[in-house]
Amino acid sequence: MKKKLILVLNCGSSSVKFSIIDVIEGVLYISGIANTINNVSFLKIYDIKKKIKIVKKNISTDSYKKLILLICDLLFIHFNKYLKLIIGIGHRIVHGGKDIKKSMIINKKILLKIKKSAIFAPLHNPYHLIAIKIILNKFVKLKNRNVAVFDTSFHQTMPKKSFLYGIPYSFYKKYSIRKYGAHGINHFYITHECSLFLKKSTNNLNIISCHLGSGSSITAIVNGKSIDTSMGLTPLEGLVMGTRCGDIDPYIIIYMIKKLNFSITQIQKILTKSSGVLGISSITSDFRELEKKYYSHKKAKLAIDIFCRRVSKYIAGYSSLMPKGKLDAIVFTGGIGENSSFIRKKIIKNLSIIGFFLDIEKNLIKTGNNNRFIHTINSKPILVIPADENKIIAKETYNILIKNNF
């Protein structure tokens, strides 16, 4: 049977991740990443099947466009045999606005909606658009086989009592100001993976999914659907993150303008790039480094304590949204959620009140196929499930192409 490969692109302002996946067999062929954009420090492409690695270090590019073009050129030069088997291209899109509720074939109308929503995802949507336009020109035969998979789609099931803010209703009606959420692709994936591990249908599954990384969000999922999530109009709301502030008193912004004479541009940069655990610790946004300094650096300890406290508060709060108090599991995912036993321990320590207890030994074992559960025998389930957004994007892309008779 002819292989059906999907090229997946995940573009942000500071990194580009890409992969080629056999959507039928679920096999990863190519995995690549470029970190930072201006003066890119490295670009790595791995051929998983043949165990070949291409590394470009100290690459100097003066534009995002040139970086995407470089990635395309390297793929065509070294991996053209795989490109010939590609049947579609999936693009992760962070924000789709209020109207988009599912993955869509990319056309002029969809591009316009992505552009319109860029105000809510300035670190992502503009870069998605640059990449899409280049891909459409480079892969001409697949021009009608590009699919946008939206992070916000999974959260479109939230009720108004979850997504509306306590501001005049007219702001929602006139300007679409409401909670949209993020990380929906992975929260969707976690929902389906968790249903397999718990041997329950997604329609009967009630969980709290904790995507913890440099950007973090928590989602309350009832009967397999998102009913509330910590990120809001933008990915700035919610948990304290690597460099993002999370929930703050809105008057802080007014104070910064009126009393401290900060400009809107300065405030945006502070809240998105200089806050979070970086701002609190004054040393780094890297949670691994903060963990190492936890017992020797007061502000490193403070940053982690504040992060974990906020996560615990959200989990406890979302547990109250479960029908008849029935919460099937807490799931940890994302770079921190998957890899930091230390942070998981600190978070769960505060949740015995809602029936969750950590098995210390299981928590320390590196997550594998046989080690997803990290709770004690008298606890409700606690799982660790590695994120795999690319797998979902590839499947969604394939499904949309099939539905549209491609």
Curated annotation (Swiss-Prot):
Q: Does the keyword Nucleotide-binding apply?
A: yes
- Name the Enzyme Commission number(s) assigned to this protein: 2.7.2.1
Q: List the residues marked with site Transition state stabilizer.
A: 183, 244
Reactions mediated catalytically? acetate + ATP = acetyl phosphate + ADP
Cellular component, GO annotation: cytosol
InterPro entries hit by this protein: Ac/propionate_kinase (IPR004372), Aliphatic_acid_kin_short-chain (IPR000890), Aliphatic_acid_kinase_CS (IPR023865), ATPase_NBD (IPR043129)
Q: What is this protein called?
A: Acetate kinase
Q: Which organism is it from?
A: Buchnera aphidicola subsp. Cinara cedri (strain Cc)
The organism's taxonomy opens as:
Bacteria, Pseudomonadati, Pseudomonadota, Gammaproteobacteria, Enterobacterales
